[in-house]
Amino acid sequence: MTDWLYRYPPLYTGILLKRYKRFFADVQLTSGEVVTAHCPNTGPMTGVSTLGSAVQLSKSANPKRKLAYTLELIQVHDNEPTWVGVNTALPNQIVKLALAKYLFPELGNYSYIKSEVVYGVDKKSRVDFFLTGSDTERPIYLEVKNTTWTKGTLALFPDTETTRGQKHLRELTALLPQMRSVMLYFINRGDCTEFAPGDSTDPIYGKLLREAIALGLEVLPCRFDVTPEGIRYLGLAKLVI
């Protein structure tokens, strides 16, 4: 394959035995050994943390690290056997690689990409990406949200109430129309074809998202194929509002 945006290091297969204290997961490897892995996703992981699920772990070569293993992938069976990426450190890395390759034509022309730019009324927030460089287009403020919860083939965000996410929507909306504001939902599994706000978990977020769209917020629900080999971009899911 030549279209991988990201290639995983060698991974270790196991079975999820327990997830606890947000950061820890006990996993039985195929060798029979039980290890405690770092869980980089501290959210509820609704629908994707079923005990007994197949998982994939990476292993750090750093001897000083307290937990050598990191939980990277969990296999779900909502539609067909599908790997779901659960390492929340990866989406922003992968989006940055995709931006450098200009894989999102919806964003138009830009030549400058900067990460973690301070913005907001109180200047206490950071947007994931700031894009500029075109003389004819407004600068772009782009926020990335990792998305793993689904109902059938409909991806949903958020999977729990998120006051932080609500704040991000308000701040992106406040930039309009002088700037372009873009919310990119990183659908971290390949079995979804549509996207909608998770109204049942956070109706305020859904309301704010719809209001923001009406005022000019752009939404990119981006589908990614996730396997133990790596991650690649599949295009946009249909936005269901």
From Swiss-Prot:
It comes from the Bacteria. Disulfide bonds: none annotated. InterPro entries: SfsA (IPR005224), SfsA_C (IPR040452), SfsA_N (IPR041465). It holds the Pfam family SfsA_N. GO terms for molecular function: DNA binding. Belongs to the SfsA family. HAMAP family: SfsA (MF_00095). This is Sugar fermentation stimulation protein homolog.
